[in-house]
Amino acid sequence: EISAGVAPGSDYPVFDTRFGKLGMMVCYDGFFPEVARQLSNRGAEVIAWPVWGCNPALAGARACENHVYIVSSTYEDISRNWMLTAVWGHFGEPLATASEWGTVVVSEVDLGAATHWNSLGDYKAQLPRHRPEWGVSP
């Protein structure tokens, strides 16, 4: 990729779109919780994640850890149970899942849904306080 002019980035951009604030992880990025956290801290409400394959539990974990929707898209054959094309909710559950290879998944989500957990209060508002970005003052 580097020889073709693609270089690694050093930022985690979030884009304002007509359907919400969108961040993106690419494949291996999703294996590290810090990537989704940086996107969430920057205001992402939805994180798109094209990924060749991995344990589907990672998509649920990234959604739950950061109270964002994860939209995973994979080339993997669903029958291998290696990754899913799906929309994942705030609690880490798949809201919609592709039933076969090569299909599209659609799910309506509520970006205004409360991020309140009974024992923690407004969970998403607490994230920057508990896991601040390294080197940045609140």
Residues of each region from the PLM?
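Active-site catalytic loop in hydrolytic enzyme cores
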Residues: 1-42, 119-124
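C-terminal beta-strand edge segments of enzyme domains
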Residues: 14, 76-138
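CN hydrolase (nitrilase-like) catalytic-core segments centered on the catalytic cysteine
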Residues: 30-105
